[in-house]
Structure formats: structure tokens, C-alpha cells
A protein has these predicted regions:
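Extracellular/periplasmic carbohydrate-active domains that bind, remodel
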Residues: 18-525
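Bacterial N-terminal signal peptides
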Residues: 7-17
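Positively charged n-region of N-terminal signal peptides that target proteins for export
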Residues: 1-5
Length: 525
């Protein structure tokens, strides 16, 4: 089939779709207004639409209150401009979730209206303006399980009872140009949760929420053999006080071929109407815990992650990659061996005003493998603390993985432990004031390449890079702003095969347990 025919088919598809039959909920007795419950009326329109071959169920301008609605095969729920589907504030009006679908095909939600879950109706104030659930909630706002060919486009979603949009075991999914606006004090208000799904594209979405903005996971025993793969997230704006893009925490099964690109991670302003928590006397912004988190702690394989062209503002931790062994969150049973994280590429990332160093870590006996960081520019917050430089970082083998689990690390910008095959190319690190910590720390590391590590004059400590028990490392083209070469701090008894290319041997610092002469070779070009 030639390109011209393919283009013609793609051009005609929207026309064919738009010519499908429409079913206006007003024709089924639905009434706008807070005093009317329209669950049965809207469901009748959905049932008829599906039974007659599919089409659009139209929600016109106005506010329509409803309990649980079940989407069925062939049905596209269309919210016209000015339409609001309002979740009921009464638990008894729900079976489970506001909108749900099970084993359906060719379904979706589209238009320019609003879906509101009435989450406040199921919360109570806990402390410091935060909320908790005070009774059983209806479930997720939108829940789609084992469905195929799903399209969610254009709509605005807000105030879910728990997660906003949850897809479990689905395939061929397009989520495009949706807006999510959730209060930052809401409990477990994830934006989009992709669980054990395949062939998913999320693009052009603007998400503002209290919990994970976009998260890939799998914690469901029914789908633990179904990999989460071929997932693309691109062109999105993500604002969260938790994690903005995350793989984890619940990770059973496999995660393959994941792409996150061309997106912005933002911070919430204390003046925002939805940001009513954790605003201290200095009125500092509400930062995301992490911009990017990749976690395997329940025995899963994460293989093939590409992250590119990301801008982050005011995050606590820019990049958090964690391989550990806590046991999955369902059975509470540890796998016999930890999972694996390998083949990760992170390139063209710009970070402004981060709090904590990025970390890539595993646990003793396991390694995060084949990670490339390229063209990373990071501006960090200063932290002068003599004790912090030599701080011992706990392993926390079975702890809940969190980007802030260690707080301030002994490195300013990047902390690597239990890693194998790491490449860092053109890494620029700046600090907003003087700091005496190394920029990078490698501990129990193998096959390391650092080409082009650039630091500013605010690094005032004894070493730019610390190596502990590191084997086969290559450093080249490393400079600070005034053109001086780096000091390297070698610790431990197992450092070997370390080459400092075009580096003055006099500017290598060694602990007594490590012999510079035996461990390091110098290549002057």
C-alpha cells in the first residue's frame, strides 16, 4: 500500500467517525441541575447506542449529576462545550467508580466539557490542610479494565475521589489533550495510572495533582503476566507535589519500551487556588518529590526506557532510579531475587533549583545496568554541612522507594551505588552558593564513563568526584569554570582500572586504603 493511499485513509477516518449516530441524553429524560440524579437516563443512552452498533452519547451544556456509568463497546461519551458530568456526592449512588468499562472495545470520552468526581464529599480535613478519606469512596473516577481501542481526548477532569484515570490491562490507547486539575491537598489523587497496558500514547496533556501525575505500575495478580510495554508520553505539562513521571511503586511483571519526551515538570505556586498545603512562612513553591522516578522493588524487569527533552523547575529530586527488594504491595512476599533495571537513556534534561541529588541505586548483590545520561544541566541548592560530606548512606534494602528517602546525600548532583555500565556525557552542574560536597559519587560501580563533567566555581570541597570500590572507570574532558582540572577522591580497597585522561596526577586525592599508583593510570593528551 503506497503512502498516498495511507494518507487518504487517515484523512477519511475522522469523517467516518464523525458521521456515526448520536444519542443525546436529553432524549432519554436526563435533566440538568444538582437536584436531579441522571444515572439511569445516561446509562439508557449508552446501552441503546452500543446495541445499535455504536456512536456518540452526547452530554449537552449544563450540569448533569450521575452515579456509576458503564461504557460499552462502540460508545464514545461526548461532552459538549459547557457540559459538566458531576459525580454524585452520595456513596449509595455508585456500584464502583464514576465511569467504568470492562472487556469493552472501541470506546472513549471526548469533547470540551468537564468530568468532576465530587471528591470533597468523601474527604475530611486531617492536618495542615491535608485531607483523608473518612468513609469508603466510590472508587476511581474513570476505570477501564481489559479494554481495546480507547480514545480519551479534549476533556477536563477534576476532583476525583481517588485516582483520576486508571487503565488496567488495556491496549491500543490514545489519551490526548486532556486537562486534569486536582487539589494539591487531596488523598491519592493520581492523574493517569497505566497498569499492565500495551500500546499507549499520552500526548499534549496538562496535569496538576497532589499525587503521581503519570504513573506506570502493575500490582494486580490477574495481570502480572501481561507486560506494560510500548508506552509513550510526550508533549505534556506535569505539576505535582509527588512524582511527575513514574514507573512504580507497585512493579510485578515486566515494563518494556517506555518513552517520556518533550515535556515540562512544573512546581505549584502557593497562590494557586488548588495549592492550599505545605506553604511555609517563606512562601516557597510546592515542589514535586521527583521529576522522574523509575523503581523496581517487587521483582519486575524494567528494560528499555528513553527519556528526552525534559525541563524541570523547582523539583526536590530530578532523577530517581531504584532497584530494591521490598516484596510487592499485594502479597507482601519478597521475590527470591530482586528484579532488574537496564537499558535506560536520559538525554537533554534541564533542571532548575533542585533540592536533592539525583540517585541511581540498587542493593548489595544487584546492579542497575546500562544507563546513559547525556546533556544534563542541573542547578542545585547549596548545602554547607561538614558532616554531610562523609555521611554514611543506609542501604534500605526493603524500604518503600521514595526520591527523598535519604534526604540530602553526600553528593550535590549525582549519587550512584551498585551500578554497572554507566555513561555520563556532558553533565553540567551548578550550585546557587558554595558547597563542599563532590558533584558525583560512585560506590560499588563497574564500567563507568564520564566525558565532559562541568562544574562552576561554587564547588569548594576537596574533590569533584568520589570513587569507592569502583572498577573500570574512564574520565575525560572534565573542567570547572576557570579551566582547572578536577580533584578525585578514591576510597575503599577495591578501586581498579581507573583512567583519568588529560589529568594531572598531582590533583588526585586518595584515602590511605587506596593506592593511587596501583589503581589509577593517567593519559595526557
Amino acid at each position: 500500500m503506497n503512502k498516498g493511499i495511507i494518507t487518504l485513509i487517515l484523512t477519511l477516518l475522522p469523517v467516518i467517525s464523525l458521521s456515526a449516530e448520536s444519542y443525546n441524553i436529553l432524549d432519554f429524560g436526563a435533566k440538568a441541575g444538582k437536584e436531579y440524579l441522571n444515572t439511569d437516563k445516561i446509562q439508557a443512552a449508552i446501552d441503546k447506542c452500543s446495541s445499535e452498533g455504536g456512536g456518540y452519547v452526547v452530554i449537552p451544556r449544563g450540569e448533569f449529576v450521575s452515579g456509576t456509568l458503564e461504557l460499552k463497546s462502540g460508545v464514545m461519551l461526548q461532552l459538549e462545550h459547557g457540559a459538566r458530568l458531576q459525580g454524585s456526592s452520595r456513596k449509595e449512588d455508585y456500584t464502583k467508580h464514576l465511569i467504568r468499562a470492562l472487556d469493552a472495545e472501541d470506546i472513549g470520552i471526548c469533547g470540551h466539557g468537564v468530568i468532576d468526581g465530587s471528591g470533597y464529599s468523601f474527604w475530611y480535613v486531617k492536618e495542615n490542610g491535608l485531607y483523608e478519606h473518612d468513609r469508603p469512596v466510590p472508587g476511581y473516577m474513570i476505570y477501564l479494565e481489559n479494554c481495546k481501542r480507547i480514545r480519551v481526548t479534549g476533556v477536563r477532569m477534576s476532583n476525583p475521589e481517588a485516582w483520576t484515570l486508571h487503565l488496567l490491562g488495556c491496549s491500543d490507547v490514545t489519551i490526548r489533550d486532556i486537562t486534569i486539575r486536582n487539589p494539591l491537598h487531596g488523598p491519592t489523587n493520581d492523574g493517569i495510572d497505566i497498569q499492565a497496558c500495551q500500546d499507549v500514547t499520552i500526548s499534549g496533556c496538562d496535569i496538576y495533582t497532589s499525587d503521581d501525575a503519570i504513573v506506570l505500575k502493575n500490582r494486580h495478580p490477574k495481570y502480572n503476566m501481561r507486560p506494560c510495554k510500548n508506552i509513550t508520553v510526550t508533549g505534556c505539562i506535569l505539576t505535582s507535589v509527588c512524582n511527575c513521571f513514574k514507573i512504580g511503586t507497585e512493579t510485578i511483571g515486566q515494563f518494556r519500551n517506555i518513552v517520556f519526551s518533550n515535556s515540562t515538570v512544573r512546581f505549584a505556586q502557593p497562590t494557586d487556588s488548588l495549592a492550599r498545603i505545605r506553604v511555609n512562612e517563606t512562601k516557597r513553591p510546592l515542589r514535586a518529590s521527583s521529576g522522574i522516578s523509575i523503581e523496581s522493588v517487587d521483582g519486575s524487569l524494567i528494560d528499555g526506557v528513553v527519556i528526552s527533552n525534559i525541563t524541570m523547575e523547582e523539583v526536590k529530586c530530578p532523577i530517581f532510579i531504584r532497584l530494591a527488594n521490598r516484596g510487592d504491595g499485594v502479597q507482601k512476599v519478597k521475590p527470591t531475587v530482586p528484579g532488574k533495571i537496564k537499558n535506560v537513556l536520559i538525554t537533554n534534561v534541564n533542571v532548575r533549583n533542585a533540592w536533592f541529588a539525583s540517585s541511581i541505586t540498587a542493593i548489595p548483590g544487584s546492579y542497575v545496568e546500562n544507563v546513559t545520561l547525556s546533556n544534563i544541566n542541573v542547578t542545585m541548592r547549596k548545602m554547607i554541612d561538614a558532616k554531610l560530606v562523609d555521611r554514611v548512606v543506609d542501604e534500605k534494602v526493603d524500604a518503600y522507594p521514595d526520591a527523598n528517602m535519604w534526604g540530602n546525600l553526600p553528593a550535590t548532583s549525582f549519587y550512584f551505588r551498585h551500578v554497572d555500565d554507566i555513561a555520563c556525557n556532558m553533565i553540567r552542574c551548578e550550585i546557587d552558593g558554595e558547597d563542599n560536597r563532590p558533584a558525583m559519587i560512585f560506590d560499588d560501580a563497574k564500567d563507568i564513563i564520564v566525558n565532559g563533567l562541568i562544574l562552576d566555581e561554587n564547588y569548594i570541597g576537596d574533590a569533584a568526584v568520589r570513587l569507592t570500590d569502583t572498577h573500570c572507570a574512564r574520565f575525560s574532558n572534565c573542567d570547572i569554570k576557570d579551566g582547572l582540572k578536577f580533584h578525585y577522591d578514591l576510597r575503599g580497597e577495591l578501586n581498579s582500572d581507573i583512567r583519568l585522561i588529560d589529568t594531572d596526577p598531582a590533583k588526585v586525592r586518595s584515602e590511605k586504603s587506596c593506592s593511587v599508583e596501583q589503581s589509577v593510570s593517567f593519559v595526557i593528551k
